Amino acid sequence: MGGHASCPQGSVNAGAKAAALLCECDALNESDRAILATVRDYVTDPFGGGSGIAHEDPRFGRLSAANGLMETKDGKLRLSMDTRYGTSMPSEELKAKLRTVWGSRGWSLPSLESREAFHVDDNSPVPEMIRAICTEMTGVDRPCFRMSGGTYSHYLPNGFSCGVSLSAKGATLGEAVGSDALSFPEGHGGVHQPDESLDIEGFFSAMQAIAHVVLQCDELLHN
């Protein structure tokens, strides 16, 4: 079952499962099995435990390291890894660890890009303002939270990330899946799944909330 790089808990990587199976295949030579053993060992745990890069950030929680693509090109196996990490680990430190752990198995990292994590200042009044607007519109008081997702707010001097994952009955889509609000069974309808869902009435309600957020942000930032 696939998952999202920002929250991979409960997901299963198909490539890692295939690599683990092929490691037991006597028809493959020792060199090929060693290559596949690295995939099995380093990719199975989406939180970096297998490759030794596991890290807990006080703001964002556990580092996640998700493999998205595997391919053979020019006779070599190539992988892509999407690693999400917080503000307490410098990017150069993580790069050094990645080069060391993969290099120890004979792998090279021809492309290694990173950027520092984005987060809203702990003293900013904006998250509480967004929470208050959502509480007023839905009648449900929820805390703000941090997640390891990519955001264009990273490029904006006064950018703040907020989403549209509300159902018409006021529950978040995560709360609503499998309930009376949305009739999807567990494991279906979630983000980036083949049957990803969006509650239309909830979407329009969220647009109204975001309009209020934009106006309130403008007032906070210019007064």
Give the predicted meaning of each segment:
Residues S91-G106:
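Redox- and metal-dependent alpha/beta enzyme cores, enriched for Fe-S-associated oxidoreductases
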Residues M1-M89:
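Midchain, well-structured core segments that form catalytic/ion-binding scaffolds
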Residues M1-H4, S108-E113, G187-P194:
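A short small-residue
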Residues C23-S31, G103, W107, T135, ...:
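Generic secondary-structure signature for well-ordered alpha-helical cores
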Residues T38-T44, A66-G68, D82-T87, S108-P127, ...:
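A short beta-alpha structural unit
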Residues K73, I133, V140-L220:
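Zn-dependent metallopeptidase/amidohydrolase metal-coordination segment
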Residues Q9-A20, R62, M89, E93, ...:
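Conserved active-site and cofactor/substrate-binding residues in soluble primary-metabolism enzymes
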